[in-house]
A protein has these predicted regions:
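C-terminal catalytic domain of Rieske-type non-heme iron oxygenases
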Residues: 1-168
């Protein structure tokens, strides 16, 4: 049963937090088990989890409108405990320093290379080329915006009007 699974995840994370001093008492049950994601600006997504925050940024290619750059960053609170290991689905390399003393190097990968992003971001990255291809489909008639995105879009339209920026 799905509720039993969610409850077990929540309970397990709370027990682990107490054992390792992670401070998860600040989180609701839903924040412990569910993926809380939000978009800011049209090209940035933030996935919030107790273990870390994923930042994903999509930038247009400088010369080819059929291409884009996909940047990801994983931010986490330092944990000074040798027994702590981030969940494997987060895609952090084994033996990642979670103490905050050493910053992991920036890595770059091309489209056909496996960046080892982990289960969640790996699935997202694998899906992106087909999304980009769909943008050129004859059936594509424009984006469907959720309420948050509509508000952001409206804000930027109004801001550009007030700044006197010509809209295309």
């Amino acid at each position: 049963d799905l509720l039993d699974v969610r409850s077990a995840i929540q309970q397990g994370k709370r027990e682990r937090s107490l054992r390792l001093g992670l401070g998860y008492e600040r989180f609701t049950d839903g924040q412990l088990s569910d993926s809380w994601a939000t978009g800011i600006f049209p090209n940035i997504q933030i996935g919030c989890h107790p273990e870390a925050i994923f930042l994903m940024r999509f930038l247009p290619h400088d010369t080819d409108p059929q291409k884009f750059w996909y940047d990801t960053m994983t931010l986490m609170f330092p944990v000074d405990d040798p027994n702590y290991c981030p969940p494997a689905w987060m895609g952090l390399p084994e033996n990642t320093d979670v103490t905050g003393r050493n910053r992991a190097p920036t890595e770059s990968y091309l489209k056909d290379e496996d960046p080892g992003l982990g289960l969640v971001l790996g699935q997202d990255a694998a899906f992106l080329p087909s999304v980009q291809e769909g943008m050129s489909s004859k059936a594509f008639q424009g984006q469907l915006w959720g309420e948050q995105e509509q508000r952001l879009r409206h804000f930027h339209v109004e801001l550009e009007k007030r700044l006197g920026i010509q809209q295309s």
